[in-house]
Amino acid sequence: MPFIPHTEAEVRDMLAAIGAGSIDELFAEIPPDLRCGELKDLPEALSEMEVCKLMEERAAENRSALCFAGAGAYEHYIPAAVWEIALRGEFYSAYTPYQAEASQGSLQVFYEYQSMMAGLMAMDVSNASLYDGASALGEAILMALRTNPESRSRKILLPRSLNPVYKRVVRTLTRNQRVELVDLDYDRSLGRIAENALETFEGGEFAAVVIPQPNHFGVLEEVDVLADWAHRHGARSIAVVNPTAMALLKPPGEWGEHGADLACGEGQPLGIPLSAGGPYFGFLCSRQDFVHQLPGRLVGRTVDVDGREGFTLTLQPREQHIRRGKATSNICTNQGLMVTAATLYMALMGPKGLRNVAAACHANASALLERLTRIDGVEPVFPAPFFHEAAIRLPRAADRVLAGLAERGILGGHVLSADYPELGDALLICATETRGPEDMDRYAAALAEVLEC
């Protein structure tokens, strides 16, 4: 069953219309050394039935594993209703329409999302989402520079305890923006930003300070101290947070005396399944004073000429919609389907449900850490408060231990030594509400067995 729509006669007619004698002539401008030539090793085409059979055979090779890995993407239970509704034809589309007001249902969902996210973060306003948590931080940094004209600095204080992947993305996004990223070290004994490290910097030296909560080690930062330090020194405070944790911890809008200026992060924990790194979505919230500098889009509620309530794109300061020089971002669209799922997840869970999930995550992670550190040679790296991740030190090479656990059907965590060689054979472990006592016992037994090999 071929699905190529054009007949040979139609192809000839199209070539004749543009004055080309053949397909090869059409692409003659491409230098020969750039052409791939014949694909001699390409197998014969398969029928739809044969393709389905092949995919089933390949899928049968997949191995499911018990997951104790986190480091930025987390396995949470997603109520069945979330994706049952999100995949309905009213929401499920290839692209958000350019005539956005024609899709009142989608706009209302985005509006409700903005309201929920702003409430969860205790901030004034939220945009309609960005690509992912890392790019959201990059946009937040650029936004902080735009909203801080009093500071002539282009320096951003970036903690080493921030997710290293986020740092790499931020470096890419700011490389040609005259932004200088300055490392802020962490306390080796506690795993959080070292207060004495702040004392080495002069007042007014930075345009913004990035504050992760929890940080990459799972440790809770002294957010009040950091936010107040930023404001005393004329810098914007940028919170990078786990949205699930904010149901239990103090939200960014309440940090210190004045609250954080911006809050961003990865929205994947809010109803988005793990899927080879994406698609996920990023969120970005700010003070009302900075609303005109928000990247992406902002949905607002209004009334039409007949007095009926409706929803519209109140702000869309992207370069496709306004003059390039006036645009605040080149973010092309938002992760509309992911935001729809997140809105449904938050609505179905409610404030109490989100708090219960967050509390269960913390309780399970605490139980996991206690269970694993009973094993000889395994110890916590940082004796500090954490949310649902913690670092443990192993008596053997962490990467080999992970490989041994994988052979036993367990994703044991994330090796930290690649980005933090000073920590030695440290492993970042995670437990969400989906991990029970039996899972932890299985992990502990497998870890003990691997360490004895």
UniProtKB/Swiss-Prot annotation:
Bridged cysteine pairs (disulfide): none
UniProt keyword annotation of Chloroplast present: no
GO MF annotations, alphabetized: glycine dehydrogenase (decarboxylating) activity
InterPro entries membership: GcvPA (IPR023010), GDC-P_N (IPR049315), GDC_P (IPR020581), PyrdxlP-dep_Trfase (IPR015424), PyrdxlP-dep_Trfase_major (IPR015421), PyrdxlP-dep_Trfase_small (IPR015422)
UniProt keyword annotation of Oxidoreductase present: yes
CDD domains named in the record: GDC-P
Protein keywords: Oxidoreductase
Swiss-Prot/TrEMBL GO biological process terms: glycine decarboxylation via glycine cleavage system; nucleoside metabolic process
SUPFAM superfamilies: PLP-dependent transferases
Catalysed reaction equations from the record: N(6)-[(R)-lipoyl]-L-lysyl-[glycine-cleavage complex H protein] + glycine + H(+) = N(6)-[(R)-S(8)-aminomethyldihydrolipoyl]-L-lysyl-[glycine-cleavage complex H protein] + CO2
Group of enzyme by EC: oxidoreductase
EC number: 1.4.4.2
Function: The glycine cleavage system catalyzes the degradation of glycine. The P protein binds the alpha-amino group of glycine through its pyridoxal phosphate cofactor; CO(2) is released and the remaining methylamine moiety is then transferred to the lipoamide cofactor of the H protein.
Subunit note: The glycine cleavage system is composed of four proteins: P, T, L and H. In this organism, the P 'protein' is a heterodimer of two subunits.
Assigned protein family: Belongs to the GcvP family. N-terminal subunit subfamily.
Name recorded for this polypeptide: Probable glycine dehydrogenase (decarboxylating) subunit 1
Gene from which this protein is expressed: gcvPA
